[in-house]
Swiss-Prot record:
Protein's name according to its UniProt entry: Alpha-2A adrenergic receptor
Recorded name of the encoding gene: Adra2a
Stored Pfam families: 7tm_1
Subcellular localization: Cell membrane
Cystine connections: C121-C203
Phosphoserine found at: S346
């Protein structure tokens, strides 16, 4: 992505998509003469084989991981939530990076020149910027989706339909295209000038200062800033709400807003509980039923909600139809969470008069509620730590993979010399983000782990049978 063969010379531009002769590239030990001859590759045979193997593993891991994500979303009932369509689109972009961009970048790297012609050079550069930018903007969209689901819990989750999510995904691709394609149609193609004799064709991204700065801001710095601010805000909200001790909650905390009996509208019921990264499923259900700034409904269920949240919707979705538990009868209105409650756990209390006969009428409920509050308090502290870790991974990996490249890319544009080997390393390191996205956004989520196990172990079960 944004490939630059060498540091820029003042006033020398290689427009995007042009085939630029580059006689002075010091990375080539020899070149082919116009009449024929042999080309010396920029790397030794051992280094070339190592680079090919590493890039091949990167491509295989990227394709394999992202294909697993797509299959899991479309085959697991626990992952049918509309917001998981973001992951499908993100995985598709990463697969396209691994199949349509990385192979040609690898060939260009190990051969030392562009072999595939001018037309494919323009297409390759446009696709490179498009797919990589799309991957980054997808992460930004996921963070905004999570933020809105917290700050506008019921209202936003009622609007979070597959059609709306698809519209947002289309917007993400349009934004990426706006950043990627204008140089192909708006920049006049120019030669090297100065009467240099062609030596080797090279395929280089537009290095004009205005494009480098604007594309870097649009492709990385702006989405990165949005992600950081959004995640900081999410953490602040979660921290404020999870640190309200149960003993300080007022009697009003036990009541839920109208329509709170069924938790599906706020996106946290059995079919919508699975957030893209697992972070959304961590602290949010404890506060989303109240108005902004209010603590979550306090009741016996909260003591166990911390444990139940790990299973989210998967426990409900994977349980085959069978006899109902004996305590389900009088509590049909709590079907969303009741299906996830383990034997011995109490069911959600929707209001003073909504509890079933097993939840009130004796001192057992109050006695259990007191112990549950203490357990809930300890669980919330642990949950806050886990949530902090997930956010640190999401933001940290994103910045670590992309910041070095975009920083040096901008430095080159403004005239600061950067060693070509260092720039090439950062260039390839940015591609690693496409392979790490499945790890970050799925391995931390219990529902995806279950779906992956089902997909990967399906063949073993068939052989055993």
């Amino acid at each position: 992505m944004f490939r630059q063969e060498q540091p820029l010379a003042e006033g020398s531009f290689a427009p995007m998509g042009s085939l630029q002769p580059d006689a002075g590239n010091s990375s080539w030990n020899g070149t082919e003469a116009p009449g024929g001859g042999t080309r010396a590759t920029p790397y030794s045979l051992q280094v070339t084989l190592t680079l090919v193997c590493l890039a091949g593993l990167l491509m295989l891991f990227t394709v394999f991981g992202n294909v697993l994500v797509i299959i899991a979303v479309f085959t697991s009932r626990a992952l049918k939530a509309p917001q998981n369509l973001f992951l499908v689109s993100l995985a598709s972009a990463d697969i396209l990076v691994a199949t349509l961009v990385i192979p040609f970048s690898l060939a260009n790297e190990v051969m030392g020149y562009w072999y595939f012609g001018k037309v494919w050079c323009e297409i390759y550069l446009a696709l490179d910027v498009l797919f990589c930018t799309s991957s980054i903007v997808h992460l930004c969209a996921i963070s905004l989706d999570r933020y809105w689901s917290i700050t506008q819990a019921i209202e936003y989750n009622l609007k979070r339909t597959p059609r709306r999510i698809k519209a947002i995904i289309v917007t993400v691709w349009v934004i990426s295209a706006v950043i990627s394609f204008p140089p192909l149609i708006s920049i006049e193609k120019k030669g090297a000038g100065g009467g240099q004799q062609p030596a080797e064709p090279s395929c280089k991204i537009n290095d004009q200062k205005w494009y480098v700065i604007s594309s870097s801001i649009g492709s990385f710095f702006a989405p990165c800033l949005i992600m950081i601010l959004v995640y900081v805000r999410i953490y602040q909200i979660a921290k404020r709400r999870t640190r309200v001790p149960p003993s300080r909650r007022g009697p009003d905390a036990c009541s839920a807003p109208p329509g709170g009996a069924d938790r599906r509208p706020n996106g946290l019921g059995p079919e919508r509980g699975a957030g893209p990264t697992g972070a959304e499923a961590e602290p949010l259900p404890t506060q989303l039923n109240g108005a902004p700034g209010e603590p979550a409904p306090a009741g016996p269920r909260d003591g166990d909600a911390l444990d139940l949240e790990e299973s989210s919707s998967s426990e409900h979705a994977e349980r085959p139809p069978g006899p109902r538990r004996p305590d389900r009868g009088p509590r049909a209105k709590g079907k969303t969470r009741a299906s996830q409650v383990k034997p011995g756990d109490s069911l959600p209390r929707r209001g003073p008069g909504a509890a079933g006969p097993g939840a009130s009428g004796s001192g057992h409920g109050e006695e259990r509620g007191g112990g549950a509050k203490a357990s809930r308090w300890r669980g919330r502290q642990n949950r806050e730590k886990r949530f902090t870790f997930v956010l640190a991974v999401v933001i940290g990996v994103f910045v670590v993979c992309w910041f070095p490249f975009f920083f040096t890319y901008t430095l080159i544009a403004v005239g600061c010399p950067v060693p070509s080997q260092l720039f090439n390393f950062f260039f390839w390191f940015g591609y690693c983000n496409s392979s790490l996205n499945p790890v970050i956004y799925t391995i931390f989520n219990h529902d995806f782990r279950r779906a992956f196990k089902k997909i990967l172990c399906r063949g073993d079960r068939k052989r055993i049978v």
